[in-house]
């Protein structure tokens, strides 16, 4: 993998992030804490991402549901996250209009 000058991160990480600018993402900093917001910009020096309309999220896992689920949110507006502190980034997909119609009807 080609390495970039910014902290030794592969350039493919930046390409993946840049392709998702404008989409809603969940950046997980540790197993129980992260931020959910709209990816607005990607920086290479320092390596990081800017999120807008951001919520700080607390996640919990149980024996019955081992994949952590968001259990609480708190408004945080805009935030910069250094990529060195992020464990995982998930791109969140929009809800299907069919599911939304069934839920509201």
What residue spans do the PLM features occupy?
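Conserved RNA-binding domains used in RNP assembly and mRNA/RNA metabolism
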Residues: 2-105
């Amino acid at each position: 993998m080609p390495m970039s000058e910014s902290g030794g991160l592969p350039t493919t990480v930046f390409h993946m992030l840049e392709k998702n600018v404008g989409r809603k993402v969940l950046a997980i900093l540790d197993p129980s804490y992260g931020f959910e917001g709209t990816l607005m910009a990607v920086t290479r020096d320092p390596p990081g991402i800017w999120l807008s309309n951001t919520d700080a999220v607390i996640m919990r896992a149980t024996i019955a549901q081992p994949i952590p689920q968001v259990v609480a949110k708190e408004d945080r507006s805009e935030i910069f996250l250094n990529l060195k502190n992020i464990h995982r980034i998930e791109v969140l997909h929009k809800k299907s209009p069919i599911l939304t119609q069934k839920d509201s009807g």
